[in-house]
Amino acid sequence: MGIKYLLRDKMVVRSWRHIKERYCLIGVRCKNCGTVYFPSREICPKCRRKTEFEEIKLSGKGKVYTYSVVHVAPKDFEKQAPYVIAIIELEEGARITGQIVDCKPEDVYIGMQVEAVFRRIKEDGDDGVITYGYKFKPIEN
């Protein structure tokens, strides 16, 4: 049983369980077919079965696969609008959703080379906890 069992049974706060994905871009590679996924999972959709995975540190570099400009933002993000949310295809093959920063929405395009950066996501209330995580910025050529 022990601590590992408690962690698997989600007895700890959710934010602690997702530290590797949120702050380090740690993904997994299926040992059977080699497909890379982010965030981690227990079943490989390609193999269609439960299999073994190995953790891998993702480079954070990739290209914009598709994107959308958000003009009417949800609560806590109103001040950022308009902003771009994109699906990024990482060099390792995994696709990840993230905000594009450090450029105007009209400058974003499909195929644009980007890299992950660690940024402020939001703040809970006036005196609340600041949440940080990854976003993506264009790679200057």
Curated annotation (Swiss-Prot):
Subunit structure and binding partners: Interacts with acetoacetyl-CoA thiolase and HMG-CoA synthase (HMGCS) that catalyzes the first and second step in the mevalonate pathway, respectively.
Protein name: DUF35 domain-containing scaffold protein
Residue ranges crossing the lipid bilayer per the database entry: none
Pfam families: OB_ChsH2_C, zf-ChsH2
UniProt binding sites for Zn(2+): C30, C33, C44, C47
Its biological purpose: Functions as a scaffold to connect the acetoacetyl-CoA thiolase and HMG-CoA synthase (HMGCS) dimers in the channeling thiolase/HMGCS complex, which allows for efficient coupling of the endergonic thiolase reaction with the exergonic HMGCS reaction.
GO molecular function, one term: metal ion binding
InterPro entries named in the record: ChsH2_C (IPR002878), ChsH2_Znr (IPR022002), NA-bd_OB-fold (IPR012340), Thioester_dehydratase-like (IPR052513)
Family per record: Belongs to the scaffold protein DUF35 family.
Organism: Methanocaldococcus jannaschii (strain ATCC 43067 / DSM 2661 / JAL-1 / JCM 10045 / NBRC 100440)
Keyword Zinc: yes
Alphabetized UniProt keyword annotations: Metal-binding, Zinc
